Each structure stands twice: as C-alpha cells, then as structure tokens.
Amino acid sequence: IRGDLNEEISKEKLRIWEYRLDPGLFSGYNPFCAVNILHDRLFIEYEKTDMTTYLNRRGMVFCDGKPLKQVALYHEGSYWVEANGQTVHFRLPKDADPAEHKIEITCREQCFAPEIPFLSYIRVKGLTCAHAATGAPVPQRGALSCYRGHHWIIEDCTIDWSNAVGIDVGNECWHHEFIPGQIIGHSVVRGCTIKDA
C-alpha cells in the first residue's frame, strides 16, 4: 500500500472503513449514485478543465460535522464511492475509529423546496439547511429552493455544507420551456449565511 509522495504505509496503520448504504435511507434519490454533472455541457473546455469536481458523486460524508474530502483512493480524511453508488469507503483523520465520532451521510438533494413549481409570495425565515446533496452546474436546485416561484422573501436563513448550490431563486435551468405570462424570480434574499459550501 502506498501513500502520498510514494511514502510506504504499513497495513497495520491504515484503517479504511466500509459502509453499505441502505436503500431505505433514500427516497427516490441516492446522491451517491449521481455525479455532479449529469449531461455533456458545451461550456466546458474539456481539454483545459480538471473534470474531477464534475465527476465526483453528489453524496457527502461528514465526521463530527466536517466533511471528508471525496477522492479516488485512500487518503487520510477522505472517502470514495464504489461505481454502483451503494457502498462508501472512508478513512478518518489519524486513522480514527468511527465508533468514537459522529458519522453522517447526505440523503437528500434539497432540504426545503416546494413539490410543485411557480408558487408565489412565500416567506421563509430563520431556517437552517445542512448537508444537501445538490448538483452543479444545472439544474440549479439549491438546499433551499423557490422552485421557479416568484416574490419569495428568504431571510435570516443558514445554509451549511451544501454540495453545490445554497439557495436558488431563478429558473433552475436554461432548458426549461418559457411559459408566456409566467413570472419567475423577483425574490428577496437578505441576512442569510451560506457557509462552508
């Protein structure tokens, strides 16, 4: 087994943990199965772009409230996902035992969003959204979402550790068909804190 800079790591020191994801944790959406970018994007200059971020899985793993870094291999303080999205392997900082820490995974794409689009004149105040498995770049579904609605007021909310998009207040995606007369946007976001995203 090799570590950074070709430094030998003894198998006795290296502690890698495996967690098989229970499908019951997910309601129609397993973020560990979905990559950040879902389709070919014309705006990406592939020969000049490191595609790692785009091809990482949307699911995240947290240890004591802090995210582990998603990597392809076994680096300390990191995790990686098997190709089928059903098993997560992780290595904690200092090769710690997970029984001594609080381990969390993301289970949902969004924390707060309406079931139907175009709702209007809604006020959301003081809500905290954490650990959303949102994707990027489109569709832009935030941890807190207006889902194409209009005239929302979102204030004094906190978004913590969203994978990609914290708050969305627009059309979500430029591919949506424009409906004549339909109002989207015109929302106010104030006093909110988006951190560690």
Task: Describe the role of every protein-language-model region.
Residues 1-148, 152-153, 158-160, 166-168, ...:
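Extracellular polysaccharide-degrading/modifying enzymes targeting complex plant/algal/animal polysaccharides
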Residues 141, 184, 189:
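Short coil/loop residues immediately preceding or within conserved phosphate-binding loops
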Residues 189-197:
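Short, intrinsically disordered, charge-balanced linker/junction segments flanking boundaries
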